[in-house]
Amino acid sequence: MIQRIILLLALSFSLAAAAQPEEVKKMHENAKAFMRTGDFDNAIIVLTRAVQKDSKNLELQKDLVMSYYFKRDYAKALEGAKELIDRDDADVVCFQIAGNVYKALEEVKDCDKMYKKALKKFPKSGPLYSEYGELLWAAKDMQAIRQWEEGIKNDPGYSGNYYNAALYYFYTKDKVWSLIYGEIFVNMESLSERGASMKGMLLQGYKEKLFADADIMKGEEKNKSEFAKAFLQGIGKQSTLTNNGISTETLTMIRTRFILDWYENNALKFPYKLFDFQRQLLQEGMFNAYNQWLFGASENLAAYDNWTKAHAEEYEAFSKFQKSRIFKMPAGQYYQN
């Protein structure tokens, strides 16, 4: 989360730099250099003087608070964070910074109030929903999932809420959303460490949750989501393929037949980007490689390495395709209700 804020600060700094007086701009650049090397004392010295020259500069104030935060001077950081979020021009990053400071001080109640204020101002901010949910989850408040679901609904292009929601559902009796959200996240963060760990949880979810009972609809009588029921019914039609156990190969067959059935019976009622993507891979002859990438290494790393060598051309084609596009969920495809 801190790395994401640093990236956002860097981007916002580049946009604001042109509007700064030349002297202040130079001071800000020097301060950023100190921050990058971990010399937060010097960063604070320079930023404090720069703020005196340009007291309305939001980017300077954000970096000053972050420098206090990284120095672990949380009292000063909190003082600055409160000033940041009280500004009329406070942006999402201001509230993210404040959230970090409150969490460091373990001031849960004040942090809770701050996130509520933030989401009232930015009701479409995925990062704020994600981080508010993380605060609640750390406090063992099961209402955390409501924040992550709201984040998915209001900002479907942000990956963090899919990650948190998938982890939450993996630890419940849910059979659907842990797999759906987990696979969406893996495609949004295909190269991250979190993405790699999520792939292992997906394979485990198919084995231990989805196909744990011979009757895949068992326990789903009270499921209010028509989308979830349609998903389970579609998967259930292929359950005989699990008679010899679950493997990457059997999952590929199950998921192939599921996609064909989905587009015959449910796609018009429930358009869904993840399934569109799977269908595209199927049509272009890359679905087998995709499933190997998704499940193979978690099932058996040596076997997966052998597969990539034996199917080098197929694997290379998928890898190039994967690196050439960015996967994002669009608005209007939220089916939890």
Predicted regions and their residues:
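Alpha-helical segment of the N-proximal tetratricopeptide repeat
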Residues: 22-56, 63-66, 70-73
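Register position in tetratricopeptide repeats
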Residues: 36-37, 70-71, 104-105, 137-139, ...
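TPR alpha-solenoid repeat register
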Residues: 60, 94, 128, 161, ...
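Canonical tetratricopeptide repeat
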Residues: 63-66, 96-97, 131, 164, ...
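Eukaryotic alpha-helical solenoid repeat scaffolds
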Residues: 157-337
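Short coil turns that delineate tetratricopeptide repeat
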Residues: 55, 89, 123, 156, ...
